[in-house]
Regions:
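A conserved hydrophobic secondary-structure block that centers on an alpha-helix together
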Residues: 133-192
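Extended, well-ordered alpha-helical scaffold segments
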Residues: 17, 24, 94-110, 157-176, ...
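Short, flexible helix-adjacent loops and helix caps
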Residues: 61, 89-93, 113, 123, ...
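Acidic/His metal-coordination segments adjacent to aromatic residues that form catalytic metal sites
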Residues: 127-133
Length: 209
């Protein structure tokens, strides 16, 4: 017997009208995302500096300094962008929020290396040690969050820039890892990259028909 095939329902086709959930949906859009944006930019007085946006500015050549934060610090920016994407997709477009996201994506593009590599820690601090510590370096974990965020943002806005950025990074990862001779035969110490290409491939499949 043939099994029924399940398909995702796009967020913009779902309407939640509920006194309990409406309150939290508005809270995310109006309070949490702006607060997180200020935190990423080190503008929250009582919060420890995250250095997230600053690291990207340094990698992009727009600021001077050393990398600060955890080796996976870039993922906070990716998670914020993904949350923005889901909000835009489910609650409708918001010009101010979308502008902040677009500017952040522009910065990420400037921080990307010529070969497609994207990771501010290794770009700034240890450029010669890419892919040398897959267990603790979190490069593929970070890449996974970037790819997922880009897929969500493309789905919400139809804008390709972020998707094109991570496509270059995904191509580099495919060129670097694999069973073939001369490629890296390793796997990450933290899961995330495994889920990301599913979202990416799903979008690409729709593009190509």
């Amino acid at each position: 017997m043939e099994k029924e095939k399940l398909t995702d329902v796009p967020l913009h086709q779902i309407q939640i009208k509920d006194a309990f959930w409406d309150k939290y949906i508005r809270l995310v859009k109006d309070v949490i995302l702006p607060y997180q944006w200020n935190t990423l930019n080190d503008n929250v007085k009582d919060a420890a500096p995250s250095h997230c946006i600053k690291n990207f500015k340094i990698a992009a050549g727009e600021a001077e300094g050393d990398f600060e934060g955890a080796v996976f610090q870039d993922t906070d920016v990716a998670k914020w962008l993904e949350a923005v994407a889901f909000t835009l997709d489910s609650s409708g477009r918001d010009e101010k929020l979308e502008k902040l996201a677009d500017e952040t994506i522009d910065l990420i593009g400037k921080a990307q290396c010529e070969d497609g590599y994207l990771n501010t820690y290794f770009t700034i601090k240890e450029p010669d040690r890419r892919w040398t510590n897959l267990k603790e370096g979190h490069e593929l974990y970070t890449a996974g969050h970037m790819i997922e965020a880009a897929a969500a943002y493309y789905n919400a806005t139809g804008k390709r820039k972020f998707l094109d950025i991570v496509s270059r990074f995904a191509d580099l990862i495919c060129e670097t890892f694999g069973p073939e001779e001369g490629k890296c035969h390793g796997y990450p110490g933290h899961p995330e990259i495994e889920l990301a290409p599913v979202s990416y491939t799903h979008l690409r499949a729709h593009e190509t028909g």
